[in-house]
Amino acid sequence: SVGFKAGVKEYKLTYYTPEYQTKDTDILAAFRVTPQPGVPPEEAGAAVAAESSTGTWTTVWTDGLTSLDRYKGRCYRIERVVGEKDQYIAYVAYPLDLFEEGSVTNMFTSIVGNVFGFKALRALRLEDLRIPPAYIKTFQGPPHGIQVERDKLNKYGRPLLGCTIKPKLGLSAKNYGRAVYECLRGGLDFTKDDENVNSQPFMRWRDRFLFCAEALYKAQAETGEIKGHYLNATAGTCEEMIKRAVFARELGVPIVMHDYLTGGFTANTSLAHYCRDNGLLLHIHRAMHAVIDRQKNHGMHFRVLAKALRMSGGDHIHAGTVVGKLEGERDITLGFVDLLRDDFVEQDRSRGIYFTQDWVSLPGVLPVASGGIHVWHMPALTEIFGDDSVLQFGGGTLGHPWGNAPGAVANRVALEACVKARNEGRDLAQEGNEIIREACKWSPELAAACEVWKEIVFNFAAVDVLDK
């Protein structure tokens, strides 16, 4: 006998190992598994471990040419999801040798690859990953990080303010640049290309870059503050993307932008490396994330996409608002905001954090709150996100009845009032509206904004909530 027996055997015989002691070098994954009727949870968890590592559907001759014990993924724990009849959390450990160094692309190709189409599973969601320090050290991470960005901008002790230029599509480059200038002159730190502004017939990228650079230099000269506009370098090829980033650097602007999910992790990591080498900050938009992360039983939670972005590289990333028009429960949002900013984050299931994560000094990422927010939200945003964040008001700036610059003034006054009140010991959560009303007395721009948006709310329950 050669020790080979053809045929199909249950995954759990090889890949379900409840006695396994995880190693410090393992990548750990928490999957929400919904097995098909009749499939035991142990078999489903083992199938996930197998199909995302060394396994296939049948025994093969070449298994004997390597050490499966060294390379296989292992399902080492399964727990039932509270309040759900047929959902389980399957914990899987992957040996580090399965993954190419410095490649988010390779990591995801294994862990969230073909296994998500596996017939024995009705649904599968990756809830969290523990990335070991040994693997993190193979990544550059964010081009600069929070402290270096503050030093570059010379801005401390408050959140940064931004605005997405609207309408997002259709403006000529010159009119677009005019809107940028008005917002920056009014007191914002940044303006932003919308995620789908690339290089369309109505506004080619080079023209936009030139007019926006002119706008921010003019605003800098008038205000004495350093200003930025997120020039979207996202393109159809990596080569074109880098060409646009090179032109931005030649113009001397401080920051460029990338749509990291539609652009892809390979392109994003290349751009992050270019940005560090050339002194550019990198703003990241998460367009397409809700396709992946919004359903509670299938896909991938945004906290995983956030960790992947910190590894791939970005200085800012959109992270929901809690109070605006886009999905995001407070505890869950603050959980992944900490994973973006902090160096060490403890396991905390009450905030959706399944594993303790040590980032071993990888630079942090500023979370960007954007989507349906306005001046009345300023106290809540300041209280929820703290100083190390970017608060981005698109319609909440450009929708001001007096124009773009007064809209920017209103936001800056509201922010300064909230920061001052907080520093004096006032409770933003309880006294927020009163603080804004007091500031209105000496800012007619803020008073006008408060009148326009006094009744705007987005009262819809979040889809992705914690298991109770």
Curated annotation (Swiss-Prot):
Gene, per the UniProt record: rbcL
Protein name from the UniProt record: Ribulose bisphosphate carboxylase large chain
Family membership: Belongs to the RuBisCO large chain family. Type I subfamily.
HAMAP family according to UniProt: RuBisCO_L_type1
UniProt site positions, description: Transition state stabilizer: K325
Listed EC numbers: 4.1.1.39
Residues that coordinate or bind substrate: N114, T164, K168, R286, H318, S370
Purpose of the protein: RuBisCO catalyzes two reactions: the carboxylation of D-ribulose 1,5-bisphosphate, the primary event in carbon dioxide fixation, as well as the oxidative fragmentation of the pentose substrate in the photorespiration process. Both reactions occur simultaneously and in competition at the same active site.
Cofactor(s) it depends on: Mg(2+)
Keywords of this entry: Calvin cycle, Carbon dioxide fixation, Chloroplast, Disulfide bond, Lyase, Magnesium, Metal-binding, Methylation, Monooxygenase, Oxidoreductase, Photorespiration, Photosynthesis, Plastid
Catalyzed reactions per annotation: 2 (2R)-3-phosphoglycerate + 2 H(+) = D-ribulose 1,5-bisphosphate + CO2 + H2O; D-ribulose 1,5-bisphosphate + O2 = 2-phosphoglycolate + (2R)-3-phosphoglycerate + 2 H(+)
Subcellular location: Plastid, Chloroplast
Subunit and interaction comment: Heterohexadecamer of 8 large chains and 8 small chains; disulfide-linked. The disulfide link is formed within the large subunit homodimers.
Organism: Solandra grandiflora
Posttranslational modification: The disulfide bond which can form in the large chain dimeric partners within the hexadecamer appears to be associated with oxidative stress and protein turnover.
Signal peptide: none
Cofactor stoichiometry and binding remark: Binds 1 Mg(2+) ion per subunit.
Sites where the protein binds Mg(2+): K192, D194, E195
Modification sites for N6,N6,N6-trimethyllysine: K5
Keyword Methyltransferase: no
Modification N6-carboxylysine, positions: K192
Highest taxon of the lineage: Eukaryota
Note from the entry: The basic functional RuBisCO is composed of a large chain homodimer in a 'head-to-tail' conformation. In form I RuBisCO this homodimer is arranged in a barrel-like tetramer with the small subunits forming a tetrameric 'cap' on each end of the 'barrel'.
One GO-annotated biological process of the protein: photorespiration
Molecular function GO labels: magnesium ion binding; monooxygenase activity; ribulose-bisphosphate carboxylase activity
Cellular component GO terms, alphabetical: chloroplast
Top EC group: lyase
